[in-house]
Every structure is written in C-alpha cells, then in structure tokens.
A protein has these predicted regions:
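Extreme N-terminal, non-catalytic leader segments
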Residues: 1-40, 44-61, 68, 94-98
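C-terminal lobe/tail of nucleotide-utilizing enzymes
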Residues: 1-26, 197-300
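Nucleotide-state-sensitive switch-loop elements of NTP-binding domains
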Residues: 18, 28-32, 55-59, 65-153, ...
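Residue-level signature of catalytic and energy-coupling elements of molecular machines
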Residues: 38, 113, 132, 152, ...
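Conserved catalytic-core segment of NTP-binding enzymes
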Residues: 55, 138-148, 153-238, 243-244
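Helical mechanochemical/support elements of P-loop NTPase systems and associated helical scaffolds
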Residues: 67, 125-128, 132, 158, ...
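A short beta-loop-alpha structural element at the N-terminal edge
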Residues: 301-314
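Conserved GNAT-fold acetyl-CoA-binding loop/helix
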Residues: 320-327
Length: 327
C-alpha cells in the first residue's frame, strides 16, 4: 500500500497528537517563524526587534524568506543585499562555491540575509524557499551559534514552500503580525489553520502570539487573538512618527529611542512566550469580529437560477435519460 494512500492519511490524521508543550522553550537556539500579510509590517517589526535583541546582548540572525527580498532593507538603511538564490546561481555558472561572506551581512550585532526568489513569472517562489534552505544547510546552518533565528515569511501565499517551517518542524514557534483590518486577520487566521493542520499530522509547532501593528484602538485584532487563544505580544501604535521613520529606513528599536520600551517589551515576550495550539475561526467567526456595516456580513446568499443565468425565461425540458424498471 502506498504511503500516500488517502485511507492511510485519513487514519493518521484521526489520531489526536500530544498536547503542544506549554513550558518555556529550552533549546539553545530559538528558531521563530514570523508570518503576516504583505504590508502588515513584518519587516519593520523584525528589523527593530532583532536590533533591540542584539543591543541586549543576544546573538540574532534575521533571514528574509519573502521573494520581495525587502526584510533587511530597513536594517541596512535601505540598501538591498545579494540574495542566496541569486548569488548561488551566479556562483554555479562561474564554477565557484558560495561562501557565507557572499550573502550574510551585519549591523551592530545583528546578522541578516535574504533567501530571495525567482523573477516574476519565471519560477516557483515556494521552491525557491526550499532551495534557499538547502543552501543554508550546506553553509553550516545547523552549526551556527545564535540565540535567536528569526524567519520573515509571507503569509498571503498558501504554497507549501512558505509553510516549510511549520510542516517540517524547522521552528519551535510561530508569530503572526496583523492590524485591525479584515485582510491581515484573515491571513493570521490562515496561519493558525496551518499550524493546527500540521499538529493533527503529528507536528509540534505552536503559535506564540501576535504582534499588533498600526494599532488604531478599534480592538478587532485583540478580539481575534482572544478568540483563537493566543496572546498579543506587543501593540505598536498607528503613529505618524513611526510611519515616517520606517519609510526613511530608520531603526526605532534602539535602547535610547522614544519607542525603546515597545521593543524591549516585544523582545522579552518573544523570548518567553510558549508555543500554543490555536483555535482558528471559520469565515463567519472572522467576519463577526467586525461590524456588519464594515464587512457586509449581514447579507444573505441568494442562489442563482437557470433563468438568471440566461437572462430570459427558462422552461425545464424533459430529460432524455432512459430509466429502466428494477428487475
């Protein structure tokens, strides 16, 4: 019998896995995958978080796992870095070996790199992520000595490559980034669904919590976090000063900055938050977090008819199917 037989897979999925560990993470290196909708502020939050952690004496590696390759831009003052995939291809064509000095760069104690991805229309982004991690392993990823490895993942895409850390237990915990809007919470809910799915398949990854970015005080993100059973690790306000500094590639997560306390709190919570098993919402549950005036959730579905589809009156024709009497 094939290991991919549907009956076998259903049988495996029906077994209740062990509970998610809820104690402190004890592995020497914490590998944390951060997911969120494009534009939700993942890269902004991670650049400042990683900088604050480094200033607190932690060894931090930040890896951009988004084909846009913009995770490290804020950290390096807007400068783009050579991606692992692009550099690997160039080195291979030249008959050379890729070295860590070709793709990893540092600022004030933070080490950072970009996996990259194919050009638009020229390949699979998820496959690019897998290739990138294969290259990291060849460069000695499992032998490096970091306290934290932060993985910045795009959450909009359902491709399995972007779910690699969850599917293969490559990280100990997941953090979602969202705001008080339906689309970012939809993505956060999907990430929770992915975690729950792989838990049922025997995985061990849990969700440590949510970073609430651009918080305008309306409360939907807090309600979502409470509903799915995860904590809010930090609430970054919707503030014009933060927006301007982020747009100008300025780090605000410095110990002497106006916003230092935000990222000190976030660094502490990210380090200590245990991985939890979330309870994802269905579509109606997600919509109910918002006023029906905003989402249109009070609309009742009206089925279409054949007459509607033809734009004219429709008369049901007798069937030509031959029905035989039972013998």
């Amino acid at each position: 019998m094939s290991m991919f037989d549907p009956g076998v897979l259903r049988e495996e999925a029906s077994h209740e896995p062990d509970p998610v560990p809820t104690g402190p993470v004890t592995k020497e290196t914490q590998i944390i995958a951060i997911y969120g909708k494009g534009g939700s502020g993942k890269s902004f939050a991670l650049a400042n978080l990683s900088y604050m952690m480094a200033q607190q004496g932690k060894r931090v590696l930040l890896i951009g796992c988004d084909p846009k390759s913009d995770t490290t831009s804020l950290l390096f003052g807007g400068k783009s870095t050579p991606t692992i995939i692009e550099t690997s291809s160039k080195k291979k064509l030249a008959g050379e070996e890729i070295g860590i000095e070709d793709v990893c760069f540092q600022r004030d104690g933070v080490f950072a790199m970009e996996l990259g991805g194919p050009e638009v229309g020229r390949g699979c982004g998820g496959r690019g992520i897998i290739h990138g991690f294969e290259t990291l392993e060849k460069l000695g990823f499992h032998e490096w000595g970091f306290d934290y490895v932060l993985l910045d993942f795009l959450g909009d895409v359902v491709c399995g490559g972007f779910g690699l850390p969850i599917a293969r237990d490559m990280c100990q915990k997941v953090i979602v980034v969202a705001s008080n809007d339906l689309q970012s919470l939809y993505v956060a809910n999907n990430v929770c669904k992915a975690v729950e799915y792989f838990r049922k398949m025997g995985g061990n990854v849990g969700v440590a919590g949510m970073i609430l970015n651009k918080d305008d005080g309306t409360g939907e993100a807090n309600a979502f976090a409470e509903a799915v059973g995860i904590p809010v690790l930090c609430a970054i306000p919707a503030n014009e000063d933060i927006r301007k500094k982020s747009a100008n590639y300025q780090i605000i997560g410095k110990p002497d900055s106006q916003w230092a306390s935000l990222f000190e709190e976030l660094a502490e919570n990210v380090a200590e938050a245990p991985p939890l098993r979330p309870t994802p919402l269905d579509q109606d549950g997600l919509l109910n977090l918002f006023s029906a005036d905003i989402t249109g959730a009070d609309y009742t579905l009206r089925p279409a008819t054949q007459a509607d589809m033809r734009g004219a009156e429709y008369v049901t024709k007798p069937s030509l199917e031959v029905v035989y009497d039972a013998v």
